[in-house]
Each structure stands twice: as C-alpha cells, then as structure tokens.
Amino acid sequence: MLTGTFLFGAASAAGYQARFAAIDLATDEKRAKQLSFVVWGSTIGAVAGPNLMQPAGNFAENIGLPRLVGPYLISATTLALAAVVIALFLKPDPYLLANKSNSLDANTSSTREALSHIYRNPTALFAIAAIAIGHIAMVSVMVMTPVHMAHVDVTLSVIGLVISVHVLGMYAFSPIVGSLSDRLGRVRVIQIGLAILLLSTLISGFAQASDAYTLGVGLFLLGLGWSCTLIAGSALLSESVETSFKASSQGASDLVMNLAGATGGAVAGVIIGTLSYGWLCFAAAVPVALLAISSFKLKSESL
C-alpha cells in the first residue's frame, strides 16, 4: 500500500507540472490564460472521479477482485492513457523548442541550485510563497470541514455537496482567473486571491457546523482564492527565473507547495482537536494576511 501510494504521488506530481509545460511557448500576453486551461481541465476529473467509485467497485467484484481495488484500476488505466497521449502527441517537446535545444544538458540545474536562485530573487520568492501559502490555507481548512460538519451529524450527501462546491471554486473559473492575470498583472491577481482566502476563512470560521449553506460559500471562496494564487503565482514564477533555472524552479515550487499542504493538514488536525474549527480558520488566515501585506511592498518596488 505504501509503495503504491508513493507511486501515485509521483504521478500526481508529474501531473502538476503539466501547467508549466503549457506555457513554455506562450507569449507574455497569454501565459497565464494558457496555464489556466490546463488547470481547468482538472475540473473534468475532479467531478467525474468520485462518481466512478460505484461502477469501479462493481467492475472489480465482477472480475473477482476486492471492491476497493476498482478505483485503483480506474486510476491506473487513466494515468497510463495520459502517459501514452503525452508520449505520442506532445512533440516536439515545448521546453526544448522554447530553448532551441535538442538536449537539456545546457539548461538544467539541481533543485538545490534552483532554491538558492529563488532565494536571491524577491519576485520568484514571492511567487512560491503565494503558491505555498494559498495551498496550505486551502488544504488545512478543506480537509477538516467534513470532520467539523460530521460532528453534528450532517449527512454525507450534504458534506459531499459542500466539497463539490469547493472543487468547483478551485477549477471551474480557472480560465477567467488566467485572463485576469494577463490583463491586471500577476501580483494584483495574487492579491485578489489572498483577499478571497481571507474572506473565506472568516466566513467559514464564524459558521455553525450545521450551516451547510454558509460553509459552502466559505469553501467555494476558499477554492477560488486558491485558484488565483496558484495560477498567477505559477505564471509569475515562470517569468521571474532565468531559463537555466526554469524547470528545476518549477519542480521546487511544487515540492514546497505539497510540503506546505502536508504540514497544513497535519497541523489542522492538532488545532481542531485542541481548540476548534473556528480557530483553525483564523490560524490559516494569519500567513495569508502577512503575505498580502508584503505583496504591496513588492508591487510598489516593481512599478
């Protein structure tokens, strides 16, 4: 189980990198919009995936396997299909074409070198901070909301609806977010995303566990704010690093993002266990607010 989960995690990490591949050949005027369409494509899987649980389980039982094997079979099949499609049709490699090279030898750097380069680059550092902090706020509140609602016996169908609305906010409006990022600028859309995240934590933090409507609004805004920080932050990162550090910096950003998410999920459990869901939401708002304040300094220096 541990090995399988590790391999699925590696596949997920590769999938996240697809958004960067989409902008290797993009112009400055359309970079965020093109990235956002890749993120928007996740909406299909996010909506269809949970609905395949039942038929996948039935299929597994029909071929003599445990019911819980079914979702893994579906996941393995779709991942294999994705790999085949990319291998056959993503030619020539957009990264190689963008750098007018047939090899990566002249354009690679290690993750450690990339992190060092980012640390010396305030704009790139802000971009990764926006991605990571948006992710940690989203994950920490999102994973504990079903637990919070279940404590007062809210039905699973209602909880599922709230999470579905959250996923809608995360992915469905990605093209709009990308277009705004191209028109208004990356930093401004990140600021908008941070403001939405702050609003969502306040709405969710003051909501009663039984108030599915208010929690749904809060979780929708949580997803939308995350979308803004991810899309605008990813575009800003790609633009702010040197070509030789671009690929490794993009990988480093996802490493930091997912470590932040894992930390947020772990800490969220401790906070809700010792304090309350409301305090969890307010705690998630703190790094968001601090980054929002620092963003105005960055924006003023870049003008």
Please tell me what each predicted stretch does:
Residues 244-275:
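A late C-terminal transmembrane helix in Major Facilitator Superfamily
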Residues 91-128:
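Juxtamembrane intracellular "pre-TM" segments in multi-pass secondary transporters
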